Regions:
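Solvent-exposed residues in well-ordered beta-strands and their adjoining turns
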Residues: 54, 72-74, 83, 134-138, ...
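Flexible, gly/pro- and Lys/Arg-enriched active-site loops
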Residues: 120-127, 139-145, 150-245
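N-terminal, polar/charged subdomain of small-to-medium soluble alpha/beta proteins
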Residues: 1-78, 245
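Short loop/turn motifs enriched for small/polar and acidic residues
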Residues: 52-56, 114-116, 173-175
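Extended accessory regions or peripheral subdomains of proteins
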Residues: 77-97, 105
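Residue-level signal for inorganic ion chemistry
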Residues: 35, 85, 111, 201
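A generic structural signal for short beta-strands and their flanking turns/coil linkers
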Residues: 47-49, 65-67, 104-110, 127-131, ...
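Short, surface-exposed acidic-centric catalytic microdomains
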Residues: 1-10, 95, 99-140
Length: 245
């Protein structure tokens, strides 16, 4: 019971009033979305919001009592796997992390140490540098996918060769406890439990994060995938820790 742990409701009301008078919206859906995100960004102690906006004077030529939109938004916990095996590998990974820091819809909570791993697949290429990042984000899964794809593109990522070399690779490993099964997005990452180069850095920052399908922690999955067993994701990783971030 500490006031330091609460949000000042008067300040929140003033923020809403200022936000809605200084910005123009055509749709109440947009008002709800943008105001909610604004509140979550402005007041760090707010983790989730149920928000309703009423429009009792909507231009509807029929009898009605009220028109309203209700939404729920929150800071979502996500874990990203990052990797590079072209050029300044560490520089590309740090560029990705900096881009996440600069994104007002993301909060970087933790970054693992980087590890060096052998590549997977038939393509001869340099070893990878891999790491994991823990974030909170206002993005929904598809929005987060678009964001990490943009960050990859800014690092000149190309997809010409399957399992080929890349300047930057970012994968959404976990997103809350959600299961997403879409054509262009699978969460949790479909091969994460088989890949040391994902689990090893992920354990550094989230050993007790749980795979929502396998119902196993990161530590448990890593324990089952020992280096003397062949890693399905990299053929037996040769791992070396790099500088701490």
């Amino acid at each position: 019971d500490d006031l330091e742990d609460t949000v000042n409701y008067a300040k929140a009301c003033k923020f809403i009033n200022k936000f809605m008078t200084e910005n123009r919206f055509d749709l109440i859906e947009a008002v709800a979305e943008q105001t909610t995100r604004g509140l979550l960004k402005e007041f760090p102690k707010i983790k989730a919001i149920d928000f309703t906006i009423n429009k009792p004077n909507a231009p509807i030529k029929l009898p009605f009592g009220n028109v309203a939109v209700s939404i729920s938004r929150k800071w979502n916990k996500a874990y990203l796997s990052i990797g590079s095996n072209i050029g300044d590998k560490e520089g590309y990974l740090n560029q990705a992390i900096d881009s996440l820091y600069d994104d007002e819809n993301c909060r970087v909570l933790a970054v693992s140490k980087f590890i060096e791993t052998e590549p997977y697949g038939p393509v001869e290429q340099d070893n990878f540098l891999n790491g994991c990042v823990e974030i909170e984000t206002l993005y929904e899964p598809k929005e987060l996918l678009a964001t990490v794809n943009r960050i990859e593109a800014e690092a000149n990522r190309t997809r010409e060769i399957h399992w080929g070399p890349r300047t930057l690779d970012i994968a959404i490993v976990l997103y809350n406890n959600d299961i997403v099964n879409e054509k262009d997005l699978l969460i949790p990452h479909v091969e994460m439990h088989k890949r040391l180069f994902v689990l090893e850095p992920l354990k550094q920052i989230a050993p007790y994060a749980v795979h929502p399908i396998l119902n196993k922690t990161v530590s448990q999955m890593l324990e089952e995938l020992q280096p003397d067993n062949k890693c399905a994701g990299c053929g037996g990783c040769s791992m070396k820790q790099m500088s701490e971030q």
